[in-house]
Design a protein with these regions (language model features):
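GHKL/Bergerat-fold ATPase module
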Residues: 1-214
Length: 214
């Protein structure tokens, strides 16, 4: 292939951050040792010499992570559309080596915790973090019921109208996208609510019409 016009830095050194890596950040450094796959890190344990090189890759990635997170902390209020850049899709289980699986589980957890504590969700006239608020999102069980184009739209409108009576919710136009983002961090996150919880809260609420309940 003709590589003219492409910076040599991007030709000779691995680039982390493809659509298969697991998040919407590109990590690039000439300090990375080349790996067989450019969309991840692999940590072999059988060869000590090779292992030391791959361990350096994790150190570089951890350092870059701190840099990106510091930038996010400093500019959280100025960054728009967080919902489009904060989802995680790491496939921690496809790696052969347990040490690699463990690393990416930890890496995902680090980013999940970070995003949960960052003021990134627009709520009214302010930005809030998920951890420091009582904001709620739909569980994946509910989201899956919205797939039918016609029935799903009617169900969504009714369920959102019911949920917002007793819960703090993001805007109707963003609730599905944000629900998917939060589930990508943790499918069991306590901010994700299901039909049973919505119905239970409504049932305990005074002055709720039967049309809302049913």
């Amino acid at each position: 292939k003709n590589l003219s016009g492409i910076a040599k830095l991007f030709v000779y050194f691995p680039l982390l951050g493809t659509e298969n890596f697991g998040m919407d950040v590109i990590f690039h450094s000439k300090k990375f040792f080349p790996v067989e796959e450019r969309n991840g890190l692999h940590l072999p344990v059988s060869n000590a010499n090779v292992r030391s090189k791959y361990e350096q890759n994790t150190q570089v990635l951890d350092s870059l992570t701190e840099m990106v997170q510091q930038y996010y902390r400093e500019h959280a209020e100025n960054i728009t559309n967080w919902v489009n850049i904060s989802g995680l899709s790491f496939d921690c289980e496809h790696h052969k080596e347990d040490v690699t699986k463990d690393y990416f589980r930890t890496f995902k957890k680090k980013w999940s915790n970070f995003f949960q504590n960052l003021p990134m969700v627009d709520f009214g006239d302010r930005r809030i973090s998920i951890t420091e608020s009582d904001i709620r999102f739909f569980s994946q069980e509910i989201i899956s019921d919205f797939t039918d184009e016609k029935a799903g739209e009617v169900y969504f409108e009714a369920l959102y109208d019911a949920a917002i009576v007793t819960n703090s919710m993001v805007a109707r136009s963003e609730i599905i996208a944000w629900s998917n983002v939060v589930a990508s961090w943790d499918e069991l996150h306590p901010s994700l609510i299901g039909v049973e919880e919505i119905a239970k809260k409504l049932g305990a609420c005074d002055n709720v019409s039967k049309s809302t309940l049913y």
